[in-house]
Amino acid sequence: MLFDREVAKLEITDELITQTTYWKQIIDEYTKDNSNGAEIINKARIMLVYYRPAEDNRVILESELQSKPTATYADVLENVNISNLDSNMTLCQVESVEKVYDNGSQKWHYIATLKAIHKYILQDIYGDEETISSSSIDIEKLPLKYIEGMVATRFGSENNGDEMALADPSLDFNGFEEVINTLIYDRNWNDAMLLYRYIRGYSAKEIRNWTKGTSEMMPDFINDDESRLETLVRALTGFFLLPPYELFTIYSMPSALHQFEALKSNFVLMVRLIKKFINELNLGNTDKLLNIYNALTDNELFKNSMEQIKENSELEVQFNYEVERIYKWHKEYLQLGYITEDDLKLIISLIEQNQNNLSKRSSKKDTSAMKDKIDKELNKKIQSNLDKQQKEFLLREKMKAIKEQLNEADDEDGDDEYSKIVNDPVLKQMYPEWIIKAIKTERDKLKNMMSSSPDANITQTYISNLKKLPWRKVEVENLDINRAREILDKNHYGLKEVKERVIEYLSLIINHRNINKESSEKDLIKIDDHNQIDLQLFKENTKNKAQKQFNNVPILTLVGPPGTGKTSLARSIAEALDKSYVKLSLGGLHDESEIRGHRKTYVGAMPGKIIKGLQSAGVSNPLILLDEIDKMSSDIKGDPTSAMLEVLDPEQNTKFQDNYIEHEYDLSKVLFIATANYYENIPAPLLDRVEIIELNSYTINEKIKIAKEHLVEVVLAQAGLKPDQFIIDDKALEFIIKHYTAEAGVRSLKRNLDKIARKIVTKIVSGEKIDKFVIDQNNIPELLGTPKISESEKEMQPQIGSVNGLAFTSIGGTTLQIEVSWFKSKQPGIRLTGQLKEVMQESAKIALSYVRANAEKFGIKNVDFDTTEIHVHVPEGAVPKDGPSAGVTFTTALISALAKIPVSQEVAMTGEITLRGKVLEIGGLKEKSFAAFKKGIKTVFIPKNNEKNLSDIPEEVKEAINFIPVSHYEQIWEHLFKGKKSDESETESKKKKQSK
């Protein structure tokens, strides 16, 4: 049995739903899409009825406490007698309905959560009149299925039972009484009854006589022997002027509660009948009648009743039927002559007369009286507000005086955790003294504010943010360098140099901790196994050596193309040190307040990202990742980069100022790590405060190993597949990498593997049995679609005026074909196409100037540069290109075209050229070498100053490519052109030999 406020679960079975549509309505209401956040306000209610076990219940019960598993709701109704009903009942509210999948039955079930509201006592039952009213049948022995309704009273009240049953808000006892009183006061009720009686078949004469007789015989409204409900029902039946047969129907009902509900239904029926009558009326002017209808419907009682009717389709059908039935009778009354059109005209004239009289009385009211009424209402509202404020102020002053007399501290804070910490002499040290004082000051201000004041909400939010900050709370770090190395190796394949740099960086941090361990241990207070209180924080001691040494550790910045593992590497560092990990996305940030926070006086003000990150971590020494630090920008709202200078400067971040907090915060224990795609985009002052670690592109073999050792395992776990259901070899992975990805990292590769896994899962869910699934080059297009990247055809024969260059882009390295042709023209000079930007255009012009100056040496003959137009084109014109590293490639292509000497397509080059032919250093050599390796290039010319970068290139690339360092372009010319004749010379010599 459920008692008040107890909660229970109820399974809504298919049988329950078929018994009544009520449960179907509840399921639809509670499980509909509430994505807009709307809550169910009018929650459904049910009455739980209990029965006691007896001998004749063995069909449904195993014992007194256990039901048979096979027993159904229908079995209960068929086999439990009315005599077994318990007198106790519980009114419950349906709090929620949850949809749950049952693996056993392979079906969805609905589970309702019920909350008990009140206990009720069973008073009476009613049902089939022929069965229950029969004197020959013992009602007690009838099964429950004959019951159609029950009457119950709320438990625990000495008042009349019917009145307590009205505790159910849906009865709207007071609302009905108020509506009727208002309608009577405005004379609308009398007009409505005139019209209603006519519709029901009464002539104008009968209505006037009956109204007069009823008013004379109306009994006293109050009767001491009746309950309030009985008195209201008796009065309402008089106001409704019901005919005898309807009065008999109402008074024969088992209780006043049923009579009250019948009168409510009668009211709704009357209003809907009047509406239909007005719509069907052929008279020209129906404004007066519409006024009556509007008065009857302009109240919450009628609106709520109509909503309940619309929700219950059976009730809606019943009301429509009753309206049509009574209106049909009305037409028959007209045909039989019981009522006439003259009766209607007389009734309408009476209604108009009543409304005109009411209007005249209203217009004759004294203007000063109306003014006094308005003033009285305004004064009443003002006085009410003043009384409320004075009452609140008086209560606060009394509370303050009582606490002063009892000498009690104000511990009522609503934050039990904060109170517990502050009252503990040890844990209290987690908060600096000035912060505790500041919180107390703000709380004192809050006490003197009105709860409705906007400042009260601002102050409460400010206090809450101060409490949430960890202040001196730090977490215990793991200082095991071997563990750090194991975690990096486990989570990341390759990146040997990057890992070594990270290990060196961590070693420096760990060494500082170990050196100062003994001196700092005395300032550490243990909270638990994972957290401590560090008294060195927020300490007015500028000579804190440990802190200075720690601050001298540079901020690590990981720079590399997207998908190369920068974010995951930072997460691994946090895991290695057992630090909390907080990621702050700075991409697109252009407002300084996002870093420093807003002043608390602003509407909706909150702390900046740094303080929010510390609140999220819960400690003052987390690892904070500053993601995409190169993508911040400045505008009229300030420069966030300048704010980051204070955060990352070891000399300033011990006293970081957030505009919202208004207190200095020590960031010296925070381990900051930043990520960026291009260090060129990081402002110079910020770059000066960080140490750069570059993460370069992966080779195809590295991507294959990463996929096999890391990505495939993750894909299987996310898709719920077995290893045999996702078998992929190296060739298939290489095919995906070459034809479906164009990236430096492996992010796109992971997406494509996820897509394949989803295709396999779809096949399995669709009913296809797959124990083993092999992914190869043949079925990859079926799984991923048409290849997005097609390999360009490799030119096997040497070409004139076409040379392979190497470029470095955001997705890694790529080869760049440079083409040159020349012809006589009236517009001599150089024409550049292929969407070349300014620096690359200058590089091409420098190359042409160098070639013209050394044309004789390079074997360029019969070319008049003053009448020759030279066209330089870089294919893939839709892609912008820039940079000086194609200088030697431009030079080689120009010499090849002008001297008509072909260049091998297995040769590529990179380097900036000067007017004197010097070859200068370039960047991104590793990525460019990957591109050459991928295309099958055998020889690559590189600047002499880049020879040091060859150690960064994997051995497999160096074994396949011959790198030739050069300091001057003549060295390239000697390799490619020296001693070679042009195609024209060779053709002429062949002709001469043939002629001989």
Curated annotation (Swiss-Prot):
Residues 797-979 form the Lon proteolytic domain. The keyword Hydrolase applies. Keywords: ATP-binding, Cytoplasm, Hydrolase, Nucleotide-binding, Protease, Serine protease, Stress response. Induction: By heat shock. GO terms for cellular component: cytoplasm. Pfam families: AAA (PF00004), Lon_C (PF05362), Lon_lid (PF22667). InterPro entries: AAA+_ATPase (IPR003593), ATPase_AAA_core (IPR003959), Lon_bac/euk-typ (IPR004815), Lon_lid (IPR054594), Lon_proteolytic (IPR008269), Lon_Prtase (IPR027065), P-loop_NTPase (IPR027417), Ribosomal_Su5_D2-typ_SF (IPR020568). Its main location: cytoplasm. Its EC number is 3.4.21.53. It is found in: Cytoplasm. It is an enzyme of class 3 (hydrolase). CDD domains: RecA-like_Lon. ATP binds at residues 560-567. It catalyses: Hydrolysis of proteins in presence of ATP. One of its GO terms (molecular function) is serine-type endopeptidase activity. The keyword ATP-binding applies. GO terms for biological process: protein catabolic process; proteolysis. The active site is at 885, 928. Homohexamer. Organized in a ring with a central cavity. ATP-dependent serine protease that mediates the selective degradation of mutant and abnormal proteins as well as certain short-lived regulatory proteins. Required for cellular homeostasis and for survival from DNA damage and developmental changes induced by stress. Degrades polypeptides processively to yield small peptide fragments that are 5 to 10 amino acids long. Binds to DNA in a double-stranded, site-specific manner. Belongs to the peptidase S16 family. This is Lon protease. It comes from Mycoplasmopsis agalactiae (strain NCTC 10123 / CIP 59.7 / PG2). The gene is lon.
